Amino acid sequence: SKSIADNPNVAVLMDQDAGLLPSGFNPNHDTGDTGNDYPYGQCTWWAYTRRAQLGLPAGSHFGDARSWGDSARALGYWVDNMARHVGDIVVFAPGQQGADGYYGHVAIVEEVNADGSIKISESNVKGLGVISDRTFTAQEASQMTYIHY
Protein backbone atom coordinates (compact mmCIF):
# COMPACT_ATOMS: atom_id res chain seq x y z
CA SER A 1 0.00 0.00 0.00
CA LYS A 2 1.10 3.55 -0.71
CA SER A 3 -0.80 4.87 2.30
CA ILE A 4 0.78 5.81 5.62
CA ALA A 5 -2.23 4.47 7.53
CA ASP A 6 -1.42 2.11 10.40
CA ASN A 7 -4.76 0.29 9.91
CA PRO A 8 -4.33 -1.92 6.81
CA ASN A 9 -8.05 -1.70 5.95
CA VAL A 10 -7.88 2.10 6.02
CA ALA A 11 -4.70 1.97 3.92
CA VAL A 12 -6.51 0.06 1.15
CA LEU A 13 -9.38 2.57 1.15
CA MET A 14 -6.97 5.52 1.14
CA ASP A 15 -5.20 4.10 -1.91
CA GLN A 16 -8.58 3.94 -3.68
CA ASP A 17 -9.29 7.53 -2.62
CA ALA A 18 -5.97 9.01 -3.77
CA GLY A 19 -6.59 12.59 -4.86
CA LEU A 20 -9.91 12.83 -3.02
CA LEU A 21 -8.67 13.03 0.56
CA PRO A 22 -8.98 16.32 2.42
CA SER A 23 -5.81 18.39 2.49
CA GLY A 24 -3.61 17.42 5.42
CA PHE A 25 -5.69 14.35 6.30
CA ASN A 26 -3.95 12.19 8.93
CA PRO A 27 -5.13 8.56 8.75
CA ASN A 28 -3.58 7.82 12.14
CA HIS A 29 -5.82 10.21 14.08
CA ASP A 30 -7.22 9.19 17.47
CA THR A 31 -10.12 6.85 16.67
CA GLY A 32 -11.76 7.20 20.08
CA ASP A 33 -12.20 3.41 20.15
CA THR A 34 -12.22 1.90 23.63
CA GLY A 35 -14.80 -0.83 22.93
CA ASN A 36 -18.52 -0.89 22.21
CA ASP A 37 -20.09 1.30 24.90
CA TYR A 38 -23.41 1.76 23.07
CA PRO A 39 -26.64 0.20 24.42
CA TYR A 40 -27.31 -3.25 22.92
CA GLY A 41 -29.56 -3.24 19.89
CA GLN A 42 -29.54 0.50 19.27
CA CYS A 43 -28.49 1.87 15.88
CA THR A 44 -25.26 3.16 17.44
CA TRP A 45 -24.45 -0.31 18.82
CA TRP A 46 -24.87 -1.83 15.34
CA ALA A 47 -22.82 0.85 13.60
CA TYR A 48 -19.94 0.24 16.02
CA THR A 49 -20.32 -3.57 15.78
CA ARG A 50 -20.40 -3.63 11.97
CA ARG A 51 -17.39 -1.31 11.66
CA ALA A 52 -15.45 -3.63 13.99
CA GLN A 53 -16.45 -6.62 11.81
CA LEU A 54 -15.06 -4.77 8.79
CA GLY A 55 -11.84 -3.80 10.59
CA LEU A 56 -12.66 -0.09 10.43
CA PRO A 57 -12.43 2.42 13.28
CA ALA A 58 -15.39 3.81 15.19
CA GLY A 59 -15.45 5.93 18.32
CA SER A 60 -16.86 4.50 21.52
CA HIS A 61 -18.31 7.80 22.72
CA PHE A 62 -19.68 9.58 19.64
CA GLY A 63 -22.91 10.26 21.56
CA ASP A 64 -26.43 10.14 20.17
CA ALA A 65 -26.67 9.24 16.48
CA ARG A 66 -27.32 12.84 15.45
CA SER A 67 -23.92 13.92 16.82
CA TRP A 68 -21.76 11.22 15.22
CA GLY A 69 -20.63 13.31 12.25
CA ASP A 70 -19.45 16.18 14.43
CA SER A 71 -17.87 13.84 17.00
CA ALA A 72 -15.97 11.95 14.29
CA ARG A 73 -14.84 15.14 12.55
CA ALA A 74 -13.50 16.50 15.87
CA LEU A 75 -11.25 13.42 16.18
CA GLY A 76 -9.95 13.78 12.62
CA TYR A 77 -12.15 11.31 10.71
CA TRP A 78 -12.92 12.13 7.07
CA VAL A 79 -16.59 13.19 7.05
CA ASP A 80 -18.52 14.43 4.01
CA ASN A 81 -21.78 14.00 2.08
CA MET A 82 -20.82 11.24 -0.36
CA ALA A 83 -21.09 7.49 0.18
CA ARG A 84 -17.76 6.07 -0.98
CA HIS A 85 -17.21 2.62 0.50
CA VAL A 86 -18.81 -0.40 2.08
CA GLY A 87 -18.45 0.30 5.78
CA ASP A 88 -19.04 4.05 5.67
CA ILE A 89 -21.18 5.21 8.59
CA VAL A 90 -24.35 6.98 7.42
CA VAL A 91 -25.56 9.72 9.76
CA PHE A 92 -29.24 10.67 9.52
CA ALA A 93 -30.28 14.03 10.93
CA PRO A 94 -33.25 13.98 13.32
CA GLY A 95 -36.39 13.23 11.28
CA GLN A 96 -34.46 12.44 8.08
CA GLN A 97 -35.77 9.36 6.22
CA GLY A 98 -37.80 8.32 9.26
CA ALA A 99 -35.00 8.81 11.80
CA ASP A 100 -35.99 9.62 15.36
CA GLY A 101 -36.95 13.28 15.62
CA TYR A 102 -34.56 13.89 18.50
CA TYR A 103 -31.77 11.30 18.40
CA GLY A 104 -31.33 10.90 14.64
CA HIS A 105 -30.02 7.59 13.31
CA VAL A 106 -26.84 5.89 12.11
CA ALA A 107 -26.35 2.92 9.80
CA ILE A 108 -23.66 1.28 7.68
CA VAL A 109 -23.23 1.41 3.91
CA GLU A 110 -23.28 -2.17 2.55
CA GLU A 111 -23.39 -1.34 -1.18
CA VAL A 112 -22.55 1.71 -3.26
CA ASN A 113 -24.16 1.22 -6.67
CA ALA A 114 -23.01 2.65 -10.00
CA ASP A 115 -26.12 4.86 -10.18
CA GLY A 116 -25.25 6.44 -6.80
CA SER A 117 -27.89 4.57 -4.84
CA ILE A 118 -26.83 2.86 -1.62
CA LYS A 119 -27.92 -0.13 0.44
CA ILE A 120 -27.50 0.14 4.20
CA SER A 121 -27.69 -2.17 7.19
CA GLU A 122 -29.13 -0.84 10.42
CA SER A 123 -30.49 -1.82 13.82
CA ASN A 124 -33.55 -0.78 15.82
CA VAL A 125 -35.76 0.21 12.86
CA LYS A 126 -37.76 -3.05 12.95
CA GLY A 127 -37.11 -3.74 16.63
CA LEU A 128 -34.34 -3.54 19.22
CA GLY A 129 -31.37 -5.56 17.98
CA VAL A 130 -33.10 -6.47 14.70
CA ILE A 131 -30.70 -5.90 11.79
CA SER A 132 -32.49 -4.82 8.62
CA ASP A 133 -31.60 -3.08 5.38
CA ARG A 134 -32.89 -0.31 3.16
CA THR A 135 -31.91 1.14 -0.19
CA PHE A 136 -31.79 4.86 -0.93
CA THR A 137 -31.70 6.57 -4.31
CA ALA A 138 -28.70 8.67 -5.28
CA GLN A 139 -30.73 11.81 -4.55
CA GLU A 140 -31.70 10.58 -1.08
CA ALA A 141 -28.16 9.37 -0.37
CA SER A 142 -26.69 12.75 -1.28
CA GLN A 143 -28.62 14.39 1.58
CA MET A 144 -26.91 12.33 4.30
CA THR A 145 -23.58 12.60 6.11
CA TYR A 146 -20.91 9.87 5.85
CA ILE A 147 -18.04 9.02 8.16
CA HIS A 148 -15.32 7.26 6.19
CA TYR A 149 -12.19 6.64 8.29
Name these PLM-found stretches.
Residues 1-3:
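N-terminal prepro-regions of secreted/extracellular proteins
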Residues 110-149:
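Aromatic- and glycine-rich peptidoglycan recognition patches
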